[in-house]
Amino acid sequence: KAEEEARLKAEEEKRVEEERLKEEEGEITPQVAREAETKAVPQLGDIHFDFDKSDIRADSREILQKNADWLQNNPDIKIQIEGHCDERGTAEYNLALGERRAMSTKKYLISLGISADRIYTISYGEELPIDPNHSEDAWSKNRRAHFLVITK
């Protein structure tokens, strides 16, 4: 019984430490995501990705520069970057790909002078498509990083 209690305590300590590390890295944990209130603002544009890629496309750099300019003019604002995928691939793969997309977007904004502690990331994988159709056009719209302002 003592061994079982020690094991459970160690597991709980490990879970708490993992949550702390995720928060430190700016990755939004499910608990934080539920508690955060966010809103979309028209000044922050979404960017899109090529199939199975997480690198920033040339056509996204101008959008990210505008987003960075707006953030520099609004220094008290924190944002959440959501990584999204199309429906192709497994749910697990797409969650990881969405996270890579959100993180590459975050890193690019940091390279433009935005402080890392103002940017949080979360992946929704394929769970929140903006176009539910099953076509290349729909898939290309769904492969995106979406920006929200954290209001609370």
Located regions from the model:
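Periplasmic OmpA-like peptidoglycan-binding domain that tethers envelope proteins to the cell wall
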Residues: 82-152
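Periplasmic peptidoglycan-binding/tethering modules of Gram-negative envelope proteins
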Residues: 1-78, 152
